[in-house]
Structure formats: C-alpha cells, structure tokens
Amino acid sequence: MEEPSGAQLLGPVEIRALAEKLDVTPTKKLGQNFVHDPNTVRRIVTAADLTPEDHVVEVGPGLGSLTLALVEKAASVTAVEIDPRLAAELPATFAWRAPGLADKLTVVQKDALKVQQSDFTTQPTALVANLPYNVSVPVLLHMLAEFPSITKVLVMVQLEVADRLAAVPGSKIYGVPSVKASFYGEVSKAGTIGKHVFWPAPQIESGLVKIIRTHTPWPQDDATRAKVWPVIDAAFLQRRKTLRAALSGHFGSASAAEEALRAADIDPQLRGERLDVADYVRLAGVIGS
C-alpha cells in the first residue's frame, strides 16, 4: 500500500529481496544492521522534528529504509554510504519505491569519517541516521565538527552509547563522548529501540540520541577543539585520579595543573567526571572564569 506522501517504505520482505539482489550480507566490520520495520522508521523521523526546509544528511543509509521516510519530510537528503553496492542501488530503490521524490536524493559514496563540506552541493541542517555502531561516536563528532550548518541531530546508536552520550556530570557513565557531544549544545536521549526491528537482529538494544546545536559562549571551531579536546581526553584517561594528578602530564607538572585549575575556579581535588563542558572550555583557556 502506498504511503500518503508518496514513498513506499521497506518491510522485511523488500529488505531481504534487495540484500539478495545485491548479494549483500550485513557485516560487523561496517557495523551494518538494516532496519526492516516501517513503524520504527516513522518513529525516528518523527523524533527528528524535521521541517520542509531541512536539508538532511544521513550516514549509512544501507538499503534505504530510513532514507525513503526522510525525503517525505525534508527539502533534500544527502546519503553518505561507504559500500559501493549499496550506494549504487539507492537511486534505483527510489525509482521503485518513491519515483516522485527521487530528485530530492543525492548519494555520496564515501567513508563518513572523511566526508567534507566540498562533497555536498547543499550544506545539511540536520543529521538523521542509524549510525554504523562500530564508529558511531567518531562519525557523530566528525559530522558536527565538519558541518556547522547542522543544527539538529537524531541518531540511533547502541543503547550503552546512547546512555553515555546523554549522561550528565557526576554519573558513572559520564565520560569523553558525553563532554564532547555537549560542546555543541543540548544532548538528550529520545527513546529505546528493540532488537527485533533490525536484520540481522543485533545482540543489544539501541537508543535514540537527540542533539540541538546551541549558540555557546565559545567558538565551535577547529582552533577551540584543538585546545579543549586534549584536556578532556587527559582528564578521563585515568578517571579515578584527581584532576591535579590526571592533568599533570598535559600541563607539565602537578603544580602547573593545580595552578591552571585554580585559575579556572575548579577544585584540583575533583575528578574529571564532575566537570561540565563549560568547565573544560574554561580550563583550556578559551573563555575566562
């Protein structure tokens, strides 16, 4: 049955048929799990809060389950796919399942970790994706860094990763991904996805993470990240140590670390998990106390 907006979403039968046609076996190496449940796809798109003006980038479109639903809601979709067979088939899938929307799709066959602004004819305003699970955090952070135009994010990742990304200071799972994601804005968990909606079914559940990019007191540029990222990494490298000890290598000595911490109005006896991103930016000397 045709969707009211002009796209026929893919179900289990179509997913299997496409995979067989392309001789594609989902691989752990590429972190591939194909969503075959249209209701889950609709839920993801709804959670993304897209407008008809949004230009979406999707990383790892696979066979096109989510892609078909995204073009119904957005002005355009650029799908970044590393697998040449999958990338080549997407336009054909659109001709089959959404012929009236095919002109809204652009496919970029490339590793998402290497994708650049110059690969895009239209700069994206939203990232919506079922991210490859083995590189989900690096891909998420790369896309946020490379495309300042992205103002909203809705990604599906392993549930444990979703919990870590959305963790708040002071919690046991708060760490490097939590701080670096919050560098860009507000991070929250937007739901849990069961195993049964994927083929093949993964070992663990998945989670939805939402990020709304905000205007921060610090520049969200390469120069700022070059100062802040090493401080975050050092603070969590040995997370049971106090910041005075953990940052001694970064600042040259424990006393130098203590001096920097006190200058940033941070207790040197605290551990890294107690600081929010603004503390780390201040500690890196990007903004004043």
Curated annotation (Swiss-Prot):
It catalyses: adenosine(1518)/adenosine(1519) in 16S rRNA + 4 S-adenosyl-L-methionine = N(6)-dimethyladenosine(1518)/N(6)-dimethyladenosine(1519) in 16S rRNA + 4 S-adenosyl-L-homocysteine + 4 H(+). S-adenosyl-L-methionine binds at residues 33, 35, 60, 81, 111, 130. GO terms for cellular component: cytosol. It comes from the Bacteria. It is found in: Cytoplasm. Keywords: Cytoplasm, Methyltransferase, RNA-binding, rRNA processing, S-adenosyl-L-methionine, Transferase. Signal peptide: none annotated. The keyword Transmembrane does not apply. Its EC number is 2.1.1.182. It is an enzyme of class 2 (transferase). One of its GO terms (molecular function) is RNA binding. Specifically dimethylates two adjacent adenosines (A1518 and A1519) in the loop of a conserved hairpin near the 3'-end of 16S rRNA in the 30S particle. May play a critical role in biogenesis of 30S subunits. Belongs to the class I-like SAM-binding methyltransferase superfamily. rRNA adenine N(6)-methyltransferase family. RsmA subfamily. HAMAP family: 16SrRNA_methyltr_A (MF_00607). This is Ribosomal RNA small subunit methyltransferase A.
